[in-house]
Amino acid sequence: MAAVTVEAIRKAQRADGPAAVLAIGTATPANYVTQADYPDYYFRITKSEHMTELKEKFKRMCDKSMIRKRYMHLTEDILKENPNMCAYMAPSLDARQDIVVVEVPKLGKEAAVKAIKEWGQPKSKITHLIFCTTSGVDMPGCDYQLTKLLGLRPSVKRFMMYQQGCFAGGTVLRLAKDLAENNRGARVLVVCSEITAVTFRGPADTHLDSLVGQALFGDGAAAVIVGADPDESIERPLYQLVSAAQTILPDSDGAIDGHLREVGLTFHLLKDVPGLISKNIEKSLKEAFGPIGISDWNSIFWIAHPGGPAILDQVEAKLGLKEEKLRATRQVLSEYGNMSSACVLFILDEMRKNCAEEGRATTGEGLDWGVLFGFGPGLTVETVVLRSVPIKA
């Protein structure tokens, strides 16, 4: 018998077709806050009502945020039990960690259960797990906890991503694509779960960028199943993952920073994050879509991480995008706030649901090609090229 070559083994290991998103699930805590009422609540619960000028500033931030409501695990009762979390910079990491190490995997499980149900295959067919959170750290990690909570096989191959921030919804899809395409038959469960218990704190007029975070961030978890060569009798691809890239923007050092301290996760923001992103976004688009021969940015569908309304406004203006291009993105920002890594997966879910309800020809608003952008600390940008799937009538 002839010896098997390494090349033959490698060929057998690889999938034939591209990776695709096969199912999506999302989850939020039950508790939510409306943006209109939030300034009064926030300044009351943090015992900061004497800071009247700062409260007015915060009200203006909330008014301009384009957010209607946000979901939050932290209820008034939890905050009353943990007064140090309500202070501006009081030691509180233990209390925060105690919450997130339990709640982050739990919320992730809710989203994963929905994705697995839609996928339609037994969970024993999940070969890989990617878990991503910027909310706390622990060993063994959320990936291990979720494996136990879901009852996945102990041999599932796990990846744990901590402290990546808002670009990571793109990162997880890039990793899942590589795993699915290089491991024949692989089915990758991807989970992003974020809870603001690590960043919530009272206001200070010396740290206005922290206040921006208090006005924007919300809690949520999203899960997707990614695989290549779908079993068409059961699996229904939603979006193909065609290519994926990551880059650090020039002259952007320190634009967005987060530091884990005794006081929790602190958040620092340079004012011109929207300018840095909008100035460089066309370069990323040209690199991604040049090989496909696309240069009209209104001819593709858009999934952009909604870091805040200013980023979306400036990207729209810089590229001359029609208003409807960022509709799904703005919809998610309005109804959930900025959920860090989970946002782009929520937007994928929103878009495919809108397309089905409106009778569109494809999952990409009737278009074939689309882009998914993640923006976050670094400044780091993730660019994923998507191919939509026809919606069967």
From Swiss-Prot:
GO terms for molecular function: naringenin-chalcone synthase activity. It holds the Pfam family Chal_sti_synt_C. The keyword Transferase applies. The active site is at C166. It catalyses: (E)-4-coumaroyl-CoA + 3 malonyl-CoA + 3 H(+) = 2',4,4',6'-tetrahydroxychalcone + 3 CO2 + 4 CoA. One of its GO terms (biological process) is flavonoid biosynthetic process. Keywords: Acyltransferase, Flavonoid biosynthesis, Transferase. Pathway: Secondary metabolite biosynthesis; flavonoid biosynthesis. It comes from the Eukaryota. The keyword Transferase applies. Its EC number is 2.3.1.74. The primary product of this enzyme is 4,2',4',6'-tetrahydroxychalcone (also termed naringenin-chalcone or chalcone) which can under specific conditions spontaneously isomerize into naringenin. Belongs to the thiolase-like superfamily. Chalcone/stilbene synthases family. PANTHER family: CHALCONE SYNTHASE, HYDROXYMETHYLGLUTARYL-COA SYNTHASE. This is Chalcone synthase 1. It comes from Ruta graveolens.
